[in-house]
Regions:
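H-loop/switch region of ABC-family ATPase nucleotide-binding domains
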Residues: 208-209
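Catalytic Walker B motif of ABC-type/P-loop ATPase nucleotide-binding domains
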Residues: 173-176
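Helix-to-loop junction immediately C-terminal to a conserved catalytic motif
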Residues: 59
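Conserved ABC ATPase signature
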Residues: 148-152, 156
Length: 282
């Protein structure tokens, strides 16, 4: 496997990756990205910028229409995934949590849902049951294990979808807007779970537009613009300090008003302090 600059194992290496839906609608534009083992990465961008498409390429569900995408030093191509041994290897090592948990939930009970993935990969039944017990205990799902996923609240569904991913014990977690639709308490719970997973060496890549969580979920961030390109990379602190960048990619908004004869422009960074630019008198 390719070694990163610090000697760590390189998980992902994307070079000039592009993607077109239907051969005409551009979703990704010349994306360059690298991820080493054990990193916490955020992919930031406004709705519709291509974050979900990028995660699905990283998850081996979509394939680039130009450029090269590699994972574990192997090309992520449709042909490569026809190899049953590589497909099984990849599916065991990479788990994807969709933004909408209903996409992942289709089994009669929560326990069936958690067991589905490991059983599909051919793991022994006793091992699958042990994994189910561990995951339900970790995510506090014991009381709802026999219920239908479709009878659960949005937050409970998200927990079950995450449990179905964790049951495979993947090395890499791809999370698409994981806090979307969650109440504040469940958001805090999820961040704590992600911290615990990172502490045991998991590589975590989170696509989000929620800047208030950035410093808690990532050590490095990429920023996508509305032209579907990665336009910046840096630490959470560097990204959050660059208000011009955040305005340009539509992650914060700005408004102007007059005060004491001057024009004040405010860039609102959600839960953070906002910028005051003093312009000329009108």
């Amino acid at each position: 496997m390719t070694q990163g600059p610090s000697g760590d194992q390189r998980i992902y290496d994307l070079r000039g990756v592009e993607f077109l839906y239907g051969g005409t609608h551009r979703a990704l534009q010349s994306v360059h990205l690298r991820v080493d083992a054990g990193e916490r990465i955020a992919i930031l961008g406004a709705n519709g910028c291509g974050k979900s498409t990028l995660l699905q390429i990283l998850g081996g569900l979509l394939f680039s229409t130009a450029g090269e995408a590699q994972a574990f030093s192997q090309s992520l191509t449709e042909e490569r995934f026809r190899d049953a041994s590589f497909n099984a290897f990849f599916r065991r090592r990479v788990g994807l949590l969709f933004q909408n948990p209903d996409v992942q939930l289709f089994c009669p009970t929560v326990l069936d849902e958690i067991a589905f993935g490991p059983l599909q990969l051919g793991l022994p039944r006793e091992e699958v049951l042990q994994k189910c017990r561990e995951v339900t205990r970790m995510l506090n799902l014991e009381k709802i294990a026999s219920r239908s996923p479709h009878q659960l609240s949005g937050g409970e569904k998200k927990k079950v979808a995450l449990a179905s991913v964790l049951a495979l014990n993947p090395d890499v977690l791809l999370l698409d807007e994981p806090t979307a639709g969650l109440d504040p308490r469940t958001q805090v719970w999820l961040v704590e779970v992600l911290d615990e997973l990172h502490s045991v060496g998991k590589t975590i890549i989170t696509a989000t537009h929620d800047l208030s969580l950035l410093e808690e979920i990532a050590d490095r961030a990429y920023v996508m613009d509305e032209e579907h390109d990665l336009v910046a990379e840096g630490s959470p602190e560097e990204i959050l300090d660059d208000l011009d960048l955040l305005l340009r990619v539509n992650l914060i908004h700005e408004h102007a008003h007059e005060h004491e004869g001057f024009i004040h422009r405010h860039g609102h960074l959600h839960a953070f302090a906002h910028r005051h630019d003093h312009g000329d008198r009108p």
